[in-house]
Amino acid sequence: MTPGNDSQGRQAVAGALVAMASTAVLGLLCVGSSVLAADGDAPLFGQPPAGMPNFTGKWLNPKPAGHLRTTNGSEPPLNAAGKAEYAKRQAALKSGDHKVDPVSSCLLHGVPRLLYTPLPFLILQTSRDVNFVHEANHTFRNIYWDKLPGDEPDPSYLGASVAHLDGKTLVIDSADFNDLTWLDYSGLPHGEKLTVQERYTLIDPATIQGSVTITDPDFYTAPWTTRLTLKRQPGMALAENVCMDTQRM
């Protein structure tokens, strides 16, 4: 090959590589834009069918609760075992012994406690599932529509959850919890028979009105319900949140 032809060949190869790179970048941009819009709050890939409420976005509980109460403001209906366990935890906390709180050892917050932290979280809703991505300890909940995808799960910190719609309300039913988490920061207990129902309704584009119903015959005399409000946080980024197990340092 002559020097002139060699130069032309190199230019042709370079041009081809640039074209390939441009195509790849464009493809990535298209995929990225199809998952989330510029503010990160509008999914276009696998988005819910027309007419289905879309809860995708970043949300924050503006009134995080240290101690959960029922919808009428009363104390949860603890039974004798529940009162004894709660009193023991309260005494430890008041004495300054915070290592009794599972979160102090970097265990997961559990449900519904995750919903009452002062940290934001992302809801990503698709035609297949609903995903909650929490800033708190980078906790992730993958919730399928209507039924679980596999065998009966083992007990876990977050339980096993399925979602369905009740009109315009998103309903999430969870069970199969272990007993290693607290329901709130004050130490409300639960056992492995715990079931949790979350209900979320978009009352306007920036507000979710929610409720959480707790059923646990091991520690409560009856099911009870508490409420929460979530506010949309467009443009807010989820920060890195690394748990440091100070009890072992």
List the predicted regions and their residue ranges.
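Hydrophobic small-molecule pocket/channel-lining residues, especially in calycin-type beta-barrels
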Residues: 2-9, 15-17, 22, 26-249
